């Protein structure tokens, strides 16, 4: 049976789904709320958000992601630890069991787009067994109009079945959990995890494969906003480094908070929603994001809730530190409704330095920007991936290696060309530790990071003076309004200066060792940055 009183779309027979029970076709938020409550998937909170639990996985299952090894994509994929190959025949067998599992079950279907640019958007169909995952897809992707839903043809389909588990000895998976991309069949299958982030990041992987190759569009793991003078700022960074927080500025309009493309016209958001980390969120430091946790339509993942009063506690990390809010971007008051902007004036590369030796901000030359983009140094922040309980130093190419299907040099080449063509100012911002490493120093104050980013974007820092860092070769500003002068140079914040020198030297060596894999792909100027 199909509930088609909401809208009609193309049937599911093309996916092999023929024996489902009720099919909820592009249901609106209110209907999904009803189903979430009816099916015991979540609770409506005080003031109207819906709280859910993701179960065992409270972050991405990074080691359970695969790409089917098939002729159409084999030569293009950067195979390795991130992009693990999966046998085509085993995919077919596993998918066949998933179809059998769906027999007689209710399913939810959302039809939407990935990409705000009409020239580059990808039609996406998301099929889920849980109502709240359907709401997640509705929040996170670009909603289709009623006219666009008529005869909708998906370019890619996601089938997400958390209660279906693989059999590793039979299916060739590492565990019972799997996220498998099949470019030939234009299909993504997910099982054994309720963490909704797998849905959006799988589609991000698809765009990272398609757009650079076929459209010459740079796909970026970044947030973006625009000022009153139409000056666009792009913020690169891994989860937990501050992309969402620093780009949500009441004085600038938000283009998007996590995934963007950069084409010949400018930047555009891949998404129609935001997926913000909300642990210890405060109305004073992050008012725009805070108010979304009190809105109808927002999903609160793994947030503590009083089941009687339905009030939430954003400071409670008893389930995970990776508490999240998923909400449509329209919940943010100051946005670019089209999701598109011009070419960036400034690029901010965010890092969470667990060692506390990088400055809170530094100006980058074009060569340094390329080097740091390929390095993608940061820390794996607690809770962002399953099994991570405290920050760990890591290098993640393009500030998003887990989602990059092609070799990092493909993205770096496009970035370098665009920086040169448009004269973009580039900055490295450390939102991590100051005064010592994790466990000794303290996390950089959000207020300081905001002040530094604002001064970079409005040109104040460029107009001031700089000193050269002796270890990383970075230009460090000597002053910034709202930030104590001693904070700007990280060595000044350490009690043990000798220990700082030793730690900085160690990190430089880590940079050099990691960059060896890219030296043959870059110019001499980039290779000699460190």
Curated annotation (Swiss-Prot):
Binding site for Mn(2+): 201, 221, 258
Protein's GO biological process: gluconeogenesis
Gene Ontology CC terms: cytosol
Keyword Nucleotide-binding among UniProt keywords: yes
Class of this enzyme: lyase
Cofactor: Mn(2+)
Main location: cytoplasm
Pathways involved: Carbohydrate biosynthesis; gluconeogenesis
Any Pfam family matching the protein: PEPCK_ATP
Known catalytic reactions: oxaloacetate + ATP = phosphoenolpyruvate + ADP + CO2
Cited SUPFAM superfamilies: PEP carboxykinase N-terminal domain, PEP carboxykinase-like
Positions of ATP binding: 201, 221, 237-245, 286, 324, 449
Comment on bound cofactor: Binds 1 Mn(2+) ion per subunit.
Single annotated GO MF: metal ion binding
Binding site for substrate: 60, 195, 201, 324
Reported function: Involved in the gluconeogenesis. Catalyzes the conversion of oxaloacetate (OAA) to phosphoenolpyruvate (PEP) through direct phosphoryl transfer between the nucleoside triphosphate and OAA.
Family of the protein in this entry: Belongs to the phosphoenolpyruvate carboxykinase (ATP) family.
PANTHER family the UniProt entry points to: PHOSPHOENOLPYRUVATE CARBOXYKINASE (ATP), PHOSPHOENOLPYRUVATE CARBOXYKINASE ATP
Protein name: Phosphoenolpyruvate carboxykinase (ATP)
Protein species of origin: Geobacter metallireducens (strain ATCC 53774 / DSM 7210 / GS-15)
